[in-house]
Every structure is written in structure tokens, then in C-alpha cells.
Amino acid sequence: ESRGLGDVYKRQKHYRVEGITFAIGIYTNLSMDHIGPGEHRSFREYACCKKRLFERSRMICINADDKYHGFMTANLEAPVYTYGIEQPCDVKAEHIVYERSSRGLNVTYQTTGWIKDEIVLKMPGTANVYNSLAAMEAAHLLGISPETIRKTLRNVSVKGRIEEVRISDKFDVVIDYAHNAASLESLIKTLRQYQPKRLVLLFGCGGNRSPLRRYQMLSLIHISE
């Protein structure tokens, strides 16, 4: 997370974004990350640092399914809007279908709430359903039309984020920046949703991080077999 919100969280620890007000703060989830020498001293410090983004946002879009969403929204003055799959929320995904076609791994779903539409993503898995819901809700709050949102989501892709590399029609190759246990587990579960006959996992760990991160990632090998 060298850019974007991940970078903002790091800067907040050193008060480098003091005085900046964000139009919209988006919360996806919170996991044991960025904790160790040179980063955050504890999970609580990390969570509190992350929450400061929403204390300086004019509007907040938050994942209603995440177990820390109550902590993140407590005592906020700005309006809070929700998205999700399981809990009642303002924009909700239903009837999710995971597909493997000649175009690769896709996912389609229906939205209810503010936006009622059929969404097709070429970035696979439940994690990207959540990401697209967050983007959809923020775009809606900024006045972007449902048609533009739908067309954009259908074509969006991010290099290094469940990025498919077309090598053969007999198997799929996916590259992902799964740099901790939470993201690696999410990746494995995403690929399992497409019911592969075999799943081969090749991964490494970034340097200058807590050794605990390596142990946690290694413990996930059994679910990829």
C-alpha cells in the first residue's frame, strides 16, 4: 500500500495530513497489518490512526459487514452511508454469481437500495464485489450516473490485483499483491469460488516487516491444496 489510502494512513501517524479535509472517506475492512517496528505499535493504534481519516471526511462510505464498522463510525459528525452483502445497508449486492468464461474469471450481481442495477465485473471474487460497491456508492454521492458507473465497473482492472495473465486455455494464471495473511486468505478463497480442479500457490514475503507476518502467511498453505 504505497499509494492511495494506505499511504494516507501512514502519513496520519506522523500528522502529515493535518488540515486536509477529504470529500469522501471509504472504509473497506481492518486486519492485523502495518504493526511492528517502524510501523504501528499495536492493533489499537493502527485502528485509531485509520479512524482519523473519517473524522476529517465530509461523507463516509462504510462496509456494513465488517466487524469494526461500529468502532469506525462512533461519534462521527459527518453523514455515514453503508454498503455490503449480508447486513441491511444503503447499497447491497444480491444474487452473486461467479463465472469462468473465455474472457476469464468474472462475477455478476444485482444491486438493491439506492442503485438498482445488474453489475458485471471482470475482477473476480467477493472482495471485488465489496470494492465495487464502495466505488459505486462514492460515485453515486458525487453525482455520477448509474449508467456511467455500470459501464466503468464492467471494464475496470488493476494491475497486480487478481490480475489474470492469459497463457493457456487449459489453466488460469493470476497475479496478486497479497502481502499479508488477510489478503492471501482472501485471494485463496476468491479462487476457490471458481471451483478449480487444482490450485497451485507461489508466494513470497516483503522484507523489513514483522516476522509474525511470515508465519501467518505460511499457515494458510493448507487451504490452497
What are these regions (language model features)?
Residues 158, 184-185, 189-224:
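Active-site beta-alpha connecting loops in nucleotide-dependent enzymes
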Residues 6, 23, 58, 176, ...:
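Conserved acidic residues
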Residues 1-9, 221-225:
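Single conserved hydrophobic/aromatic residue that forms the stacking wall/gate
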Residues 1, 18, 53, 220-221:
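Structural alpha-helical scaffold elements that stabilize or flank donor/cofactor-binding regions
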Residues 12-172, 196:
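Acidic, Mg2+-coordinating active-site environments of NTP-dependent enzymes
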Residues 62, 175, 203:
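Active-site flanking residues adjacent to catalytic metal/cofactor-binding acidic residues
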Residues 32, 66, 178-180, 207:
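Short, glycine/acidic-enriched loop or turn micro-motifs at the edges of active sites
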Residues 7-11, 173-179:
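Switch II (G3) loop of P-loop NTPases
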